[in-house]
């Protein structure tokens, strides 16, 4: 299978019909790769299918493959499929020209995993109601996967998913604040997310920083408190608590009343000192002018 697709990559698209009449039908070869979970090789057949079988068939195959790659956490490959699907949804009126022009580049990505330059995502440009049914299918698959990861607090996978597919996490968080992104209980969330992220590794800390930045951009307090605590970002917590003393009081009581959070008592003491200092400075600045 790899040999056939490698030959196709080096062959002018005008000769693909002859090549696959001898090697076998492209859809059948795609299906065999798909069933064997050779997803990267299967992806290389999609542009061949677009040219030989038509855009509708190739889009159907790409959507199936997108779902499968997400299920296997193959997020770089999923990102390439997303870009193909969005492009094909716009440009298949010129299918033959586009297939010949894009096939070496697209197949090169899939065969050799070469790095790509990040561009602004097409997923950010329109609201759901403005998108075509074809693009809606892509969006629905991506959002369903994001909800699956968020609900299970699989946060490192969520970060990899967002980076690989350029999924619009900010828009998703704004929409799902009371849905799949909601944290029901601070104590259980802090314990579970701490276990999931394993904060003693550099990559997990980088993932947490990535998520914290997004949560701050949408002012998602519950998540900010959890992630800033795990990262011991005292300055973030002080900035939040000095504007919300009720939240500070609840936070302090929770950390002190659960033995599992004893590791954060030093952070709590530092926060108390800093907030007291902030309060004193505020009183001085608001005091009577002599």
PLM segments and residue spans:
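Alpha-helical solenoid scaffolds
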Residues: 1-290
């Amino acid at each position: 299978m790899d040999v056939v697709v490698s030959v196709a990559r080096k062959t002018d698209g005008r000769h693909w019909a002859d090549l696959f009449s001898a090697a076998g039908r492209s859809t059948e070869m795609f299906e065999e790769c798909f069933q064997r979970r050779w997803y990267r090789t299967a992806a290389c057949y999609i542009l061949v299918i677009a040219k030989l079988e038509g855009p509708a068939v190739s889009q159907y195959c790409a959507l199936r493959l997108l779902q499968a790659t997400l299920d296997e956490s193959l997020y770089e490959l999923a990102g390439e499929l997303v870009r193909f699907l969005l492009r094909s949804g716009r440009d298949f009126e010129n299918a033959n020209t586009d297939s010949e022009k894009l096939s070496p580049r697209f197949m090169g990505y899939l065969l050799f995993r070469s790095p790509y330059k990040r561009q602004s995502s097409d997923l950010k440009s329109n609201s759901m109601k403005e998108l075509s049914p074809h693009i809606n299918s892509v969006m629905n698959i991506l959002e369903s996967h994001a909800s699956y990861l968020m609900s299970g607090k699989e946060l490192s996978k969520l970060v990899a998913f967002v980076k690989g597919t350029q999924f619009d996490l900010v828009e998703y968080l704004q929409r799902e604040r009371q849905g799949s992104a909601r944290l029901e209980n601070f104590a259980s969330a802090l314990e579970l997310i701490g276990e999931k992220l394993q904060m003693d590794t550099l990559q997990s800390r980088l993932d947490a920083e990535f998520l914290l930045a997004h949560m701050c951009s949408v002012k998602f307090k519950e998540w900010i408190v959890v992630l800033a605590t795990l990262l011991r970002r005292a300055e973030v917590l002080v900035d939040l608590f000095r504007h919300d003393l009720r939240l500070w009081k609840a936070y302090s009581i929770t950390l002190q009343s659960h033995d599992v959070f004893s590791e954060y008592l030093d952070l709590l003491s530092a926060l108390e000192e800093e907030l007291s200092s902030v309060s004193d400075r505020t009183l001085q600045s608001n005091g009577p002018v002599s």
